[in-house]
């Protein structure tokens, strides 16, 4: 496996630290007036999500992490695992609740949504839902005429269980387009 020197450190680089895969979030090169130069690095542990700060002397190396990002289609959830399939090879992978994170509330069974899955040694570490999804509103308060002062919104429960704020004109059984990164309503579908 390749090694990265402190000169190669940049945000987004995936490295191994204490036998855990990490992603570099920030890298600051420091050259004090006296003494050896060093790098102050902020890393996110990809297994636990914890952020840690480490200092490396100039010239230190870290091993590259065996991380692969693949695009896969979502198939179904069997209660404890979410199942995905590679559209070319038809290979299937199952991700647990920790790997799914927030993506679980945006995916519905048989939707065939394309997700980006981060694999470490063939095991899913993280699943990113598509940026935009279309879901049906299953529960929301009716919009009453004249209820528009301030242009506010109302909460709406979607078919996956997620709750988003929608404009007052959105009714039950309508489909809405949602940005999964922010959890915000975009438009009626």
UniProtKB/Swiss-Prot annotation:
This is Elongation factor P. It holds the Pfam family EFP. Keywords: Cytoplasm, Elongation factor, Hydroxylation, Protein biosynthesis. It is found in: Cytoplasm. The modification N6-(3,6-diaminohexanoyl)-5-hydroxylysine is found at residue 34. May be beta-lysylated on the epsilon-amino group of Lys-34 by the combined action of EpmA and EpmB, and then hydroxylated on the C5 position of the same residue by EpmC (if this protein is present). Lysylation is critical for the stimulatory effect of EF-P on peptide-bond formation. The lysylation moiety may extend toward the peptidyltransferase center and stabilize the terminal 3-CCA end of the tRNA. Hydroxylation of the C5 position on Lys-34 may allow additional potential stabilizing hydrogen-bond interactions with the P-tRNA. GO terms for molecular function: translation elongation factor activity. GO terms for biological process: peptide biosynthetic process. Pathway: Protein biosynthesis; polypeptide chain elongation. PANTHER family: ELONGATION FACTOR P, ELONGATION FACTOR P (EF-P) FAMILY PROTEIN. The keyword Cytoplasm applies. GO terms for cellular component: cytoplasm. SUPFAM superfamilies: Nucleic acid-binding proteins (SSF50249), Translation proteins SH3-like domain (SSF50104). Belongs to the elongation factor P family. InterPro entries: Elong-fact-P_C (IPR015365), NA-bd_OB-fold (IPR012340), Rib_uL2_dom2 (IPR014722), Transl_elong_fac_P/YeiP (IPR020599), Transl_elong_KOW-like (IPR013185), Transl_elong_P/YeiP_cen (IPR001059), Transl_elongation_fac_P (IPR011768), Translation_prot_SH3-like_sf (IPR008991). Involved in peptide bond synthesis. Alleviates ribosome stalling that occurs when 3 or more consecutive Pro residues or the sequence PPG is present in a protein, possibly by augmenting the peptidyl transferase activity of the ribosome. Modification of Lys-34 is required for alleviation. Its main location: cytoplasm. Gene3D superfamilies: 2.30.30.30, Nucleic acid-binding proteins. SMART domains: EFP, Elong-fact-P_C.
């Amino acid at each position: 496996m390749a090694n990265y020197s402190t000169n190669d450190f940049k945000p987004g680089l995936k490295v191994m630290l204490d036998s855990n895969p990490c992603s570099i979030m920030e890298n600051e090169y420091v050259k004090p007036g006296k003494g050896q130069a060093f790098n102050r690095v902020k890393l996110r542990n990809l297994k636990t999500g914890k952020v840690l700060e480490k200092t490396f002397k100039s010239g230190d190396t870290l091993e590259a992490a065996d991380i692969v990002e693949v695009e896969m289609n979502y198939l179904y959830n069997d209660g404890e695992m979410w199942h995905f399939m590679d559209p070319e090879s038809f290979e299937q992978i199952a991700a647990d609740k920790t790997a799914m994170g927030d993506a679980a509330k945006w995916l519905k069974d048989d939707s065939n949504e394309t997700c980006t899955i981060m694999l470490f040694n063939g095991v899913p570490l993280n699943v990113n839902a598509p940026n935009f999804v279309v879901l049906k509103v299953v529960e929301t308060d009716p919009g009453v005429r004249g209820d528009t002062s301030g242009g506010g919104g109302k909460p709406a429960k979607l078919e996956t269980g997620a709750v988003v704020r929608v404009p007052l004109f959105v009714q039950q059984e309508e489909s809405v387009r949602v940005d999964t990164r922010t959890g915000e309503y975009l438009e009626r579908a």
